[in-house]
């Protein structure tokens, strides 16, 4: 966090197949060790599987899944006196998107299916239907914020 000026956000180029910027960002989250072509293969494979299983536009399912995963509020630790409080704060839109993608990838990797495209497709389908690990994570975060609503006057 620089003191002098705000650093401009880098522009992400849209993905080659669908021309979608959000999907390109998601591929960057899936990518490990800079292997973008592998990440593209995984994401496109997962979207093909989603299309096969649901007979719906895979991008619509993807957007719906992200919307169902993205948290509205989260808790941040704030030290007041000798105590540390979990203070609920609203999540800004860019962080909502980033958290949703991060959780989607994390819970896809923890699934039991054989290949990563199958795991990702399964988690996407579950998330679009308000099920699965990533949606449960969002519910847990919301529950924490609700439980600590009393400390919301300790704003940042």
Swiss-Prot record:
**Gene Ontology CC terms, in alphabetical order:** small ribosomal subunit
Query: Any idea which GO molecular function terms this record carries?
Result: rRNA binding; structural constituent of ribosome; tRNA binding
Domain of life (superkingdom)? Bacteria
Transmembrane spans: none
InterPro entries in the record: Ribosomal_uS7, Ribosomal_uS7_bac/org-type, Ribosomal_uS7_CS, Ribosomal_uS7_dom, Ribosomal_uS7_dom_sf
Keyword tags? Ribonucleoprotein, Ribosomal protein, RNA-binding, rRNA-binding, tRNA-binding
Which Gene Ontology BP terms does the record give?
Answer: translation
The answer to keyword Magnesium applying to this record is no
Q: Which family does it belong to?
A: Belongs to the universal ribosomal protein uS7 family.
Q: Which PANTHER family match?
A: RIBOSOMAL PROTEIN S7 (PTHR11205)
Subunit (UniProt): Part of the 30S ribosomal subunit. Contacts proteins S9 and S11.
What does the UniProt function comment say about this protein?
Answer: One of the primary rRNA binding proteins, it binds directly to 16S rRNA where it nucleates assembly of the head domain of the 30S subunit. Is located at the subunit interface close to the decoding center, probably blocks exit of the E-site tRNA.
Q: What is this protein called?
A: Small ribosomal subunit protein uS7
- Source organism (scientific name): Teredinibacter turnerae (strain ATCC 39867 / T7901)
């Amino acid at each position: 966090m620089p003191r002098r000026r705000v650093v401009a956000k880098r522009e992400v180029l849209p993905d080659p197949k669908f021309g979608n910027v959000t999907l390109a960002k998601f591929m960057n989250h899936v990518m490990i060790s800079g292997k973008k072509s592998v990440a593209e293969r995984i994401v496109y494979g997962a979207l093909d599987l989603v299309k096969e299983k649901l007979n719906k536009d895979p991008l619509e399912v993807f957007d719906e899944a992200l919307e169902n995963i993205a948290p509205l509020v989260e808790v941040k630790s704030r030290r007041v006196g000798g105590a540390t409080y979990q203070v609920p704060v609203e999540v800004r839109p860019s962080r909502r998107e980033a958290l949703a993608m991060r959780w989607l990838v994390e819970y896809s990797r923890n699934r039991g299916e054989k290949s990563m495209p199958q795991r990702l497709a399964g988690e996407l389908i579950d998330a679009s239907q308000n099920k699965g690990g990533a949606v449960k994570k969002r519910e847990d975060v919301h529950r924490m914020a609700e439980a600590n609503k009393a400390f919301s006057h300790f704003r940042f």
